[in-house]
């Protein structure tokens, strides 16, 4: 699997560097579009999911990790309080998140990291974790309702909110609290099957 992902990453890099004229069009994004895409990709960055490609079956581990973490971070109002240290994420909420962001319907099951019991995935409650977010670097249309590009993933201290800022702005705001670039990913997205105004993630390959 690792060798295959490395091969695909190299292939995608070659494609980016040698696209024939007209094969893809680089889009210049306005501020509102950029922030919308930053928010979309931040959902994957904060869930800390690893590389995957559409031509391989996306592991259930990836789907469940995304669904659990997405709900834990963004939908705490829908969590079930299990005990002082643990929350329960509903199975149907995990499946809904996967469909919304990947466009795939799944039947969520237990994984090595998260156990499903009585319709809930038990997970440790959040408490002072670092913030992860993404910013779009490159956005290209293939002309076939698919887009490819690159996002940068940053890590910042708990409570950091200037997720759409630039390094220059961060330095001015607080020189002691500048987000760290921790990863870069190449991606492919397509239109959502349920909402033409939304995207779903197809490929997600870390650049090493």
Task: Give residue ranges: language-model regions.
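Beta-strand initiation motifs
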Residues: 197-199
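A broad structural signal for short, well-ordered beta-strand segments within beta-sheet-rich domains
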Residues: 126-137, 201-206
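Sec-dependent N-terminal signal peptides of Gram-positive bacterial secreted proteins and lipoproteins
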Residues: 3-23
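Exposed beta-sheet edge and beta->alpha loop/turn motif
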Residues: 133-195
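Short, solvent-exposed aromatic-acidic interface loops
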Residues: 153-156, 202-208
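Core segments of small alpha/beta cavity-forming domains
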Residues: 24-131
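Intrinsically disordered, low-complexity segments enriched in glycine/proline and serine/threonine
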Residues: 5-6, 36-38, 64, 183, ...
